[in-house]
Design a protein with these regions (language model features):
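Membrane-interface loop-to-helix entry segments
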Residues: 83-134, 192, 315-325, 350-355, ...
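TM-loop-TM module centered on a large, flexible mid-protein loop between adjacent transmembrane helices
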Residues: 11-12, 18, 50-67, 141-149, ...
């Protein structure tokens, strides 16, 4: 509300910390945030399609035979779950092709996917509870095999936050279009609060409906929780319908990211902060074609290099790393711009921002600790959060390269 300019957090970072950190945030959007998010959610779609047909997979020996070691990060297994990865790349190609050919067509497709999303959520929440085939005791019954205690319980709770934070991420996307919103001083805070509340309520209701149908142990061991819950309520056909609707719903999120995310890269290229090639508009289709292709190539590389868990974890970690900086930036702006008009003031300042700052920092430290300890103990072959940090840090030499280049051309 204080800075109603198109660009959202990119603009905030520049005002708070300067050009370097704004550039690094823009780079992170390309290297991790938007691309890992797009690759990760499309991975889910490919996995749910396995409800209908089994995708080919190499033997464990072959999957382990090709391993790329990244110093200080871990090992990448490109052949692991290869069938799902190839289908994921194909789905990303289709979404990119549609966006490349026509922005309008991409918007029409988005409407179809949105309808599927509403149907999927409605059937899951209403249908599962209405079936009467679940058990409310699932909400209070302990599982004999899942009993973390002490510090392990704390780690488990932090790990469980990843899914919730990913589901809620995006509720603030309206800030990217703040410069196009009428009366942003009132409209933005209202839409942000309402959007976050709606997302929280839907997330809790969907989760509750699945807990009602499946005991905790069954949920923990399921690869397709929503379909398994629907299958228990409505049979194989019901599970298939939910799987299909989830695929369409997830493709809607993919389509939105493929449509919008490359435009940040396109804008950075126009500002000569990215290769000029990425800032060229397609002469016929009038779309940021080169930026779209660049994003598709990088998303495909991320898909081959990881799994849904790897992509989701590193994406959420980097998002909340920058969120930490933005929360702290509230205090910076109070000092740098004390007389600026503030249509909306943070409730409970400074205690509420401090509480958010503490939770954010605690979450990041615990995730980093979990990733490193799991890697050292051999539970995982890669440190997801460190992987995201390394990819983000690659933007540092690029910043100085483009800055030096701009200085020479000036």
């Amino acid at each position: 509300a204080m800075m109603p300019a198109t660009g959202g957090q990119y603009v905030f970072m520049e005002k708070m910390y300067g050009r370097f950190w704004a550039y690094l945030y823009g780079w992170a959007n390309f290297a991790v945030i938007n691309t890992a998010a797009g690759a990760g959610i499309t991975f889910i779609c490919a996995q749910y399609l396995e409800y209908f047909f089994k995708l080919p997979r190499f033997s464990p020996e072959i999957e382990q035979s090709v391993m790329l070691h990244l110093p200080f990060v871990g090992d990448i297994l490109p052949l692991e779950n290869f069938g799902v990865k190839m289908l994921t790349v194909f789905l990303l190609f289709i979404s990119t092709y549609v966006a490349y050919r026509s922005t309008k067509l991409g918007g029409v497709v988005q409407v179809v996917f949105t309808v599927a999303k509403v149907l999927a959520i409605g059937l899951l929440i209403g249908g599962l509870f209405a079936s009467g085939k679940g058990d409310y005791s699932n909400f209070i019954t302990e599982d004999a095999t899942i009993k973390p205690a002490g510090f392990a319980l704390l780690i488990a709770m932090v790990a469980a936050c990843n899914g919730a934070l990913q589901a809620l991420d995006g509720a603030y996307q309206i800030v990217y279009m703040a410069g196009e919103v009428k009366n942003p001083g009132k409209s933005l805070p209202r839409s942000l609060i309402l959007g976050l509340l709606v997302c929280m309520i839907i997330y809790m209701l969907v989760t509750a409906s699945m807990v009602y149908m499946l005991p905790v142990h069954d949920m923990a061991s399921s690869k397709l929780v929503a379909s398994d819950a629907a299958k228990a309520a409505f049979g194989i056909i019901g599970g298939g319908i939910i799987a299909l609707l989830i695929c369409l719903s997830v493709l809607g999120a993919t389509n939105a990211l493929v449509l919008c995310a490359p435009r940040i890269t396109f804008a950075m290229a126009e500002e000569r902060a990215f290769p000029a090639w990425a800032g060229k508009m397609h002469p016929k289709f009038k779309t940021p074609g080169n930026a779209l292709v660049l994003h598709f190539i990088w998303m495909s590389i991320l898909v081959i290099s990881g799994s849904f868990i790897i992509l989701a974890d590193m994406y959420i970690f980097i998002v909340w790393t920058f969120n930490l900086m933005i929360i702290y930036g509230l205090f910076i702006l109070r000092k740098k711009m004390p007389d600026a008009e503030r249509p909306y003031k943070v409730w409970g300042y400074p205690w509420m921002p401090l509480l958010a700052l503490f939770f954010n920092a605690f979450y990041l430290v615990m995730v980093l600790y979990r990733d490193i300890s799991d890697y050292i103990s051999g539970k995982t072959h890669i440190m997801n959060s460190v992987f995201g940090l390394v990819l983000t840090a690659l933007g540092i030499p690029l910043y100085w390269y483009f800055k030096t280049r701009q200085t020479k051309q000036a």
